[in-house]
Amino acid sequence: LLWKTFHFWEQLCTPEYYTDKEGQPHYKKGKTFLEDGERYLIIPSYSPENHPIGYTSTITANAAMDIAAASDVLRMIRELEERIGDERSTERLTACRELAKKLPEYQADETGGLKEWSLPQMRDNHEHRHISHLYCAWPGVETQHDVRLAESCRQAIRNRNTGNVGKDDTASHGWIHKGLVAARLKDSEGLGEILRLLVYSDIFYSSLLTDHNTDRCRGVYCTDTILGLQGII
């Protein structure tokens, strides 16, 4: 299954769509290999339900979530093949390392926060509940070995919390997702704020089942919070 997923990313990435040394996107029909400093452009790409400022479509390019998902698959294959250690493993390890070197790099905005789309033309829209671009922290594990990336993710959460006040910030799954990421980042202060917000909100019914929203504005049962809290702890 992992190797089939490798082929998905290998086939999605084509030298015809690439970024140059400055990170600018290009399309060149018939291009068959990447030059030094060039990287694949992941297109089409998707960051759930959100789009960059000035865009109307959620279909974009170089979504950080896709970069992280591809990186995570390559990591799992490497760990598995290193344990197997046969002749086929050597070939697969080489293929994984080659693809990993050509994947897009994460980018940070002017605040140092991880960008949701790794292209200079795409500005993050913080008026949104999702933080799917922090896949590299959770469920991925890249931030466990990269201090700079971890801090960039912490700043990204702060940016989203500030930019989404009074917008769609009552969606419980958004806060649970932030809590899972904060816990993985060992951000005790940020996690404490999230837990207090949830526990002292109006999200719990008398049965202790939880609503979809912290203010119960829609009256919809949702297990995201009641189960997510346990996952965070």
Describe every region a protein language model picked out.
Residues 1, 10-94:
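The feature captures the catalytic groove of carbohydrate-active enzymes
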Residues 5, 21-25, 117-122:
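Short amphipathic alpha-helical surface micro-motifs
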